Amino acid sequence: MTSELLVAGSVALDTRDGPFGKVRETLGGSAVYFALAASLIMPVKVVAPVGLDGAKRVAQAFSGRTIDVDLLQILDARTYRWRAHQDHGRNIDLGSSDNIYDSWEPTMPANFEGWAFVGSMRPDRQAQLMGMLGAAKLLAADSMLSYVQARPPEARDVLRRSGWFFCNEEEFSALGGTDPEEFRRQWWLQGLVVKAGAMGLAAYTEYGVVRVPALTSRPILDTTGAGDAFAGGMLARWLSTGGLPAGLLDALVWGVACASITISSIGVKGIAKATHKELEQRVVEVEECLRRES
């Protein structure tokens, strides 16, 4: 079915410190943030590996949501770990333990023809997953600065396979980008989303550029996962409303609203507890901000 949404990505146990204090082995990961945001709008399938030490926390976070975990593999391995220090809204990577990818043999729905997002993870695995999603009507991917820097050829392979690509300004520069529209054409992308934190974001397509401001009137406690939550909200909203070019601005607004809910709390707490009604209220705030800046 072309109306299905799937995310393939990471499940993580994060240890981070920043203005919010310190959290140790709290639930995170690209697949988790994306799925929690998307499931506020429509059902979503999750493809990811998790160790025995993290499976219970994932089940608790996903409880009550329309999240299909049939392809979430629980392995006898340590869940992916990530350590970071947050400074001025930016996560400085302090290292990770990603050996779980070595024992993971991912499976996909046969001939999946819906929309798929391959979240940040070790790029060789990203590329493998994208190769398994060749029939997807829309195939999107995200990046992670540390992997772009450590594995540039594999990161570019992910970019080459993408229809839509999501990155922040640092990742864009690390991939050799200077002019976003030129970059989009160079890599034959249907769409490129460049995120600029508190400055908002811009989406580049063959129809032009669409900009949406960040919602700065709300408190910002922890920016981790904001990009994945944004992608989940944006793609779920766009797909659920038909996926036409005219609906892109609306979809971006919903994505920003999901990101705003996420960063208002530490870790996944905010987006995991959010309701559709709360999301709709946040969308109104983003729309008001957009009107003020237009």
Regions found by a protein language model. Name each.
Residues 36, 81-85, 200-204:
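Short beta-strand scaffold segments in enzyme catalytic cores
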Residues 45, 215-292:
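Conserved post-catalytic alpha-helical subdomain immediately downstream of the catalytic base
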Residues 117-122, 143-144, 168:
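Catalytic beta/alpha-barrel core
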Residues 38, 168, 227:
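Short, conserved phosphate/pyrophosphate- and ester-handling motifs at nucleotide-, phospho-/glycolipid
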Residues 135-138, 145-213, 219:
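Conserved phosphate/ATP/ADP-binding segment of small-molecule kinases
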Residues 35, 39, 239:
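Gly/Ala-rich phosphate-binding loop of Rossmann-like dinucleotide-binding domains
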Residues 9-11, 30, 229:
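Active-site metal-binding loops of divalent metal-dependent hydrolases
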Residues 4-5, 13-25, 40-119, 124, ...:
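Conserved N-terminal subdomain of the carbohydrate kinase-like
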